[in-house]
Swiss-Prot record:
HAMAP family, per the entry: RecX
A single GO cellular-component term on record: cytoplasm
Alphabetical UniProt keywords: Cytoplasm
UniProt-listed NCBIfam families: PRK14135.1
Compartments it resides in: Cytoplasm
Primary role: Modulates RecA activity.
Family, as annotated: Belongs to the RecX family.
Single GO BP term: regulation of DNA repair
Presence of keyword Translocase: no
Principal location: cytoplasm
Official protein name in the record: Regulatory protein RecX
């Protein structure tokens, strides 16, 4: 039966020990393993004893890795499991580590959801759908997702969302209805819900300076006209130009007036 002939502190990690059986290095163990099994020089170990020691120390390695991983920031169960799998910790040990983390409140999904909610509302321009999606991707339970997404909706101030929308609006140029449409699409992409978006849009003023709009119309007209002038006959070209400008949100009467002002049309042309 193998006998412990030496136990020495590792040089690079004072919390771990080298275990020697019959003068041969057998394995490294941590101090908790040493204490749990009351290991000491001269002690004889059966194969079953060694299997238990190895199993427990593997768990301890996984636990220490998890604790260190959790020390940097809050994590979910899914994140910890994925991390330990990459660290080649066994599924059995991972299961025991997760149980320990829940028991000691190192993993707490409600606390995680609360913290993420507060951070996102305070520091991002994202709505509840993005928050909800993040929780889902992180493996949070559906009932917690539902509860905290509702809190997100309640706690995100409408005035703050209006400010987000106005910031978007300042980067968009063009006819009022088109700018409004672009703002709406941006808010959808940021995770806001349609009921909230409509409430925000109703509070905003999308009126733009007529001179600015006139310049934009002239610019877009020239761009579309010049792009297609070699492809179509004059009548078809005018029709395509009108269609293109209407898709950009310009009103038909404004387009016709600008075409006549530019000398491109004489006022008799219609869209084909």
């Amino acid at each position: 039966m193998p006998k412990i002939t030496k136990i020495e502190v590792q040089k690079k990690n004072k919390e771990r020990f080298n275990l020697f059986l019959d003068e041969q290095f057998e394995m490294g163990i941590d101090i908790d393993t040493l204490v749990k099994f009351n290991l000491k020089k001269g002690q004889q170990l059966e194969a079953a004893d060694m299997a238990e020691i190895q199993k427990y120390d593997h768990y301890r390695i996984g636990l220490n890795k998890a604790i260190q991983y959790l020390s940097y920031k809050k994590r979910t169960e899914k994140e910890v499991i994925q991390y330990l799998q990459k660290e080649e910790i066994s599924e059995q040990a991972i299961s025991e580590v997760i149980e320990y983390c829940y028991r000691e409140k190192l993993i707490d999904h409600q606390d995680y959801a609360e913290s993420l909610k507060n951070t996102m509302i305070r520091t991002t321009d994202k709505g509840p759908k993005i928050y909800q999606q993040k929780l889902y991707q992180l493996g949070i339970e559906p009932n917690i997702i539902e509860m905290f997404t509702e809190l997100y909706r309640e706690q995100q101030e409408l005035d703050d969302i209006i400010q987000i929308a106005e910031k978007i609006s300042k980067t968009k140029k063009g006819p009022q209805n088109k700018v409004k449409e672009k703002v709406m699409q941006s808010l959808i992409q940021k995770g806001f819900e349609m009921e909230t978006i409509h409430a925000v849009l109703n509070e905003m003023d999308f009126t733009q300076d007529e001179a600015v709009l006139d310049d934009l119309l002239q610019r877009d007209l020239e761009k579309i006209y010049n792009k297609n002038r070699k492809k179509y006959t004059q009548q078809k070209l005018i029709s395509k130009t009108i269609e293109g400008l209407m898709r950009k949100g310009y009103k038909y009467d404004k387009i016709k007036a600008k075409l006549e002002e530019s000398g491109i049309a004489d006022g008799t042309e219609e869209i084909e």
